[in-house]
């Protein structure tokens, strides 16, 4: 099925072990993104150029209005589903592996989040941060470093910026679908 307005596009959307990705018709998937297996994308989500989403070991869910920017890798292990809430931004080159991301979170460019980690809503994970296995990040946190640590509480203005960024990417995805 072509998710980009009837253009002849060779997406790498593949069935694996009888699991075919379920992608809402309102989603944008870049031409060279790869989505395999047990993956669900909710309304207005987007996956950008060069990203790989492999639901070959367990389920991956990308919430409504969330965006997976260029060259990201999303993967799982058995018993480590990957769940991304609503209006989440996953910055360029980030790696998410078997973790849970609540609503309205910004994952900075190049950040790595490992199995069993849980990121609370309205949080920012700084660029290049390493969130280790099973780490629990409380909601409203700003997190940086390798290994990651909470450095302060997010401001109302920063929460608004997270929301605005997610809305911007939802609109951008609609524009790209029209190209």
Task: Describe the residue ranges of each PLM region.
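Short, Lys/Arg-enriched N-terminal segments with co-localized hydrophobic residues
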Residues: 1-11
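C-terminal segments of enzyme domains that contribute to small-molecule binding surfaces
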Residues: 12-25, 30, 82-90, 94-95, ...
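Left-handed beta-helix
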Residues: 25, 30-31, 36-37, 42-43, ...
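Active-site cofactor/substrate anionic-group-binding motifs, chiefly glycine-
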Residues: 60, 81
């Amino acid at each position: 099925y072509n998710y980009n307005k009837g253009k002849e596009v060779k997406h790498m959307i593949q069935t694996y072990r009888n699991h075919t990705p379920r992608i809402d018709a309102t989603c944008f998937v870049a031409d060279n993104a790869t989505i395999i297996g047990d993956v669900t994308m909710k309304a207005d989500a987007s996956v950008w150029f060069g990203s790989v989403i492999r639901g070959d070991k367990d389920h991956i869910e990308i919430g409504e209005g969330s965006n997976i920017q260029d060259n990201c890798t999303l993967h799982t292990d058995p018993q480590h589903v990957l769940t991304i809430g609503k209006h989440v931004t996953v910055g360029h080159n980030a790696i998410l592996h078997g973790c849970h991301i609540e609503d309205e979170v910004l994952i900075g460019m190049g950040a790595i989040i490992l199995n069993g980690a849980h990121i609370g809503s309205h949080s920012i994970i700084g660029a290049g941060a390493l969130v280790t296995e099973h780490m629990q990040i409380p909601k409203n946190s700003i997190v940086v470093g390798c290994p990651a640590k909470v450095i302060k509480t997010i401001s109302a203005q920063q929460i608004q910026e997270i929301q605005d960024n997610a809305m911007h990417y939802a609109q951008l995805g609609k524009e790209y679908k029209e190209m």
